[in-house]
């Protein structure tokens, strides 16, 4: 299926010493206010990527619920996708580099009621290195725009193989224009171990959404 990634309700709300601003996104009946860093050397984790917005919109269009489901996100960045999954009922583990966890925590606390917070864990995860400290019983794994270097692909694969089981559904979204050849090659690698189905494409932003399940 194909469609258009709609323009989010996103506007400047405030600035803090010129280094951060807040954007507002309406999705699934919630308004998420996400702090964005303007100046950072961790650029991959300090903006809301189109692939994450694509998955948010897909969850809304499909009326997905994560109630009583274990969810983990790899490379969560600002945390918007994990926050939505938490609000949709999931028991959510949010992971990224250690230096990004504080910003994720701030966004989680700004967008979720206290009643949700017993269901969220925020942890560092280095793909391919400390993934074995996490369980292998997740119902859903979320990945949005995390294939951006050739070296990352085998590390992502190793991590996904550990975290998943035969019942796990992996939603993997990519903005293909970031590096079409690299990303296409990455999906070919993943497809050797996972059934990899293109479930949606947002033509206007060149975002592909895939549903992966482990080959048996």
Region locations from a protein language model:
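S-adenosylmethionine-dependent methyltransferases
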Residues: 1-216
């Amino acid at each position: 299926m194909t469609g258009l990634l709609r323009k989010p309700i996103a506007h400047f709300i405030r600035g803090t010493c010129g280094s951060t601003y807040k954007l507002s996104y309406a999705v699934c009946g919630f308004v998420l206010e996400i702090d964005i860093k303007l100046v950072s050397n961790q650029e991959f984790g300090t903006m809301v990527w189109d692939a994450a917005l694509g998955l948010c919109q897909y969850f809304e269009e499909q009326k997905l619920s994560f109630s009583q489901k274990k969810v983990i996100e790899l490379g969560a960045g600002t945390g918007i996708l994990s926050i939505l999954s938490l609000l949709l009922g999931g028991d959510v583990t949010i992971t990224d580099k250690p230096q990004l966890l504080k910003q994720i925590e701030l966004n989680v606390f700004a967008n979720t009621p206290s009643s949700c917070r017993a269901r969220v864990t925020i942890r560092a995860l280095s793909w391919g290195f400390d993934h074995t400290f996490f369980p292998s019983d997740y119902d859903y794994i979320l990945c949005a725009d995390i294939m951006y270097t050739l070296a990352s692909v085998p590390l992502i694969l190793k991590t996904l193989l550990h975290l998943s089981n035969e019942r796990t559904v992996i939603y993997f979204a990519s903005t293909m224009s970031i590096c079409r050849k690299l990303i296409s090659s990455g999906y070919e690698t993943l497809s050797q171990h996972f059934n990899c189905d293109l479930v949606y494409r947002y033509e206007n932003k060149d975002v592909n959404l895939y549903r992966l399940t482990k080959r048996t």
